[in-house]
Amino acid sequence: MSLDTVVEDIRDEARARADEIRSEGEERAEEIIDEAEREADDIVDEAEREAERKISQERDQKLSSAKLEAKQARLEARREVLEEVHDDVEAQIADIDGDEREALTRSLLDAAAEEFDGDSVRVHGHEDDADLLEGIVADYDGFEVGEPVDCLGGVVVESDASRVRVNNTFDSILEDVWEENLREISARLFEE
């Protein structure tokens, strides 16, 4: 075998090996490209899912916020209606006069008088009820009309001797009744 043949065989072998390496390299490059494309697709898919999740979350938050605002607006409107009704009731109570006012005032004083022994008891009421109170208090021993108080009517009865103070004003009765019946009032007004 000649040297040229050996060189040629080595070259052929080197070319074959180079072709094999090139082929393996191209195959590996294709695998890397395929893997990179799959990873890129996965990244895009994940980004799309994340974007959809964020959009859904924002939509839910905005919807929740809108519902809360609507609920607050309804509650505010209801509160305003309840205040108007309360104010109307107060006005109607303040307008009670004549025999009805006297009967109510006497009844409230009777209830309060049970708490006192009759020693220097002062009865306070609305300033416009001074004459009415003078007439009613005359029927009670040890009771006298005191200074007027800011109220719709009724009486505030107190005694220094017993340190007892009974608030039987129309206002206090209204507030008690209002608080006790607020659910029912609300249900009737708003058909709940």
Swiss-Prot record:
Biased composition (Acidic residues): 27-49
Composition-biased stretches (Basic and acidic residues): 8-26, 50-66
Location of the protein in the cell: Cell membrane
Entry membrane topology: Peripheral membrane protein
One GO CC term, this protein: proton-transporting two-sector ATPase complex, catalytic domain
Molecular function GO terms recorded: ATP binding; proton-transporting ATP synthase activity, rotational mechanism; proton-transporting ATPase activity, rotational mechanism
Keyword DNA-binding attached: no
Any one of the GO BP annotations: proton motive force-driven plasma membrane ATP synthesis
Region (Disordered): 1-66
InterPro entries in the record: ATPase_E_C, ATPase_V1_Esu
Gene3D superfamilies in alphabetical order: ATP synthase, E subunit, C-terminal, F1F0 ATP synthase subunit B, membrane domain
UniProt KW keywords: ATP synthesis, Cell membrane, Hydrogen ion transport, Ion transport, Membrane, Transport
Quaternary data: Has multiple subunits with at least A(3), B(3), C, D, E, F, H, I and proteolipid K(x).
Job description of the protein: Component of the A-type ATP synthase that produces ATP from ADP in the presence of a proton gradient across the membrane.
NCBIfam families named among the record's database cross-references: PRK02292.1 (NF002629)
Record family assignment: Belongs to the V-ATPase E subunit family.
Protein name from the UniProt record: A-type ATP synthase subunit E
Organism: Natronomonas pharaonis (strain ATCC 35678 / DSM 2160 / CIP 103997 / JCM 8858 / NBRC 14720 / NCIMB 2260 / Gabara) (Halobacterium pharaonis)
Gene: atpE
